[in-house]
Regions:
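Single, function-defining residue in the core of a domain
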Residues: 2-291
Length: 291
């Protein structure tokens, strides 16, 4: 199984740059929000909308924020059925809430949240409620203990499925926006995330997808006495054009690397027997090509 690179885009410190490139800003609850997390979620939403297929987005704890969940829940098909869900690792200090109590006859606004739960403490408080299962992780069977809880996540204001996982001495918490996805499937989905790192290594060290050398004098040099702020160029049409062309060239170069990597992955999956039969080199250890 491969992690196929589909798209590459500049996301770090690009608020003004995206305006120069005439790119839309992600909307979170009707308000524009440009950040690394919101831009990634918007890019994933665009890809899934174009595919028109149900997908699961697997991310690390950096993206366990409400704007990501809010953007992804907007991706729907023509029948208003949700197409995109997220599986991510939760931050260690995550808290959630049980359902609020039923409205009583007492005056006052009804409660929106129930009992507050610090999920990291549940590993000790409810250790006897954990279930044991065997899941194939990284090609090998692995015995894990888990506890699945559907709780209200306050930043989103909705229920999220939390899966507390005990892997030997390691403890971690997963979050999933799909309340119908089983805990073992959530754990299995998250195990595929490491393949992203493998693809990054191929893109960087084998394909050279990030070895671009595009620059423009309209872009300020970064030094002790300078800043990378692009606001100085906002009134200069020529500088805007040069900077946007440079950014487009950088993104195009990286995307061509993604396309080339994807082609090589397709070839290796479909013609691996021919590749090995024509391979002229010598390897100290040759693994089974079917693995």
């Amino acid at each position: 199984m491969f992690c196929v690179p589909l798209c590459a885009e500049l996301h770090e410190g690009v608020a003004i740059l995206r305006q120069f490139q005439d790119k839309a800003e992600p909307l979170v609850y009707g308000h524009a929000k440009v950040s690394v997390t919101s831009l990634m979620a918007a890019m994933a939403a665009d890809i899934v909308s174009a595919l028109g297929k149900k997908c699961i987005l697997v991310l690390d704890a950096y993206f366990a924020v409400a704007p990501v969940f809010a953007i992804l829940q907007q991706v729907q098909d023509d029948g208003c059925q949700r197409l995109l869900h997220i599986v991510t690792r939760a931050k260690s200090n995550v808290v959630a809430y049980q359902d609020p109590p039923l409205k009583s006859a007492m005056p006052g606004r009804p409660r929106k949240y129930g009992t507050k739960i610090r999920l990291i403490q549940v590993f000790e408080a409810k250790a006897e409620h954990f279930e044991q299962t065997i899941i194939e992780l990284y090609g090998k069977p692995k015995s894990l203990c888990f506890l699945c809880l559907d709780l209200i996540w306050k930043p989103l204001g909705k229920k999220v499925r939390f899966v507390l996982v005990a892997d030997g001495s390691e403890r971690f918490i997963l979050m999933c926006s799909d309340l119908t996805l089983s805990a073992p499937d959530i754990i299995l989905a998250y195990s595929y995330r490491f393949k992203i790192e493998v693809s990054f290594k191929v893109l960087k060290h084998l394909m050279g997808s990030f070895f671009y050398r595009f620059w423009t004098h309209a872009w300020p040099r970064i030094g002790k006495q300078t800043t990378s702020d692009l606001s100085h160029a906002a009134e200069d049409v020529r500088k805007i054009r040069l900077i946007s062309q440079t950014a487009n060239a950088i993104e195009a170069f990286a995307n061509f690397g993604c396309i080339a990597t994807g082609i090589l992955q397709i070839i290796s999956l479909n013609f691996y027997q021919t590749i090995w039969s024509k391979y002229p080199g010598w390897l100290r250890t040759i693994m089974d090509p079917e693995i």
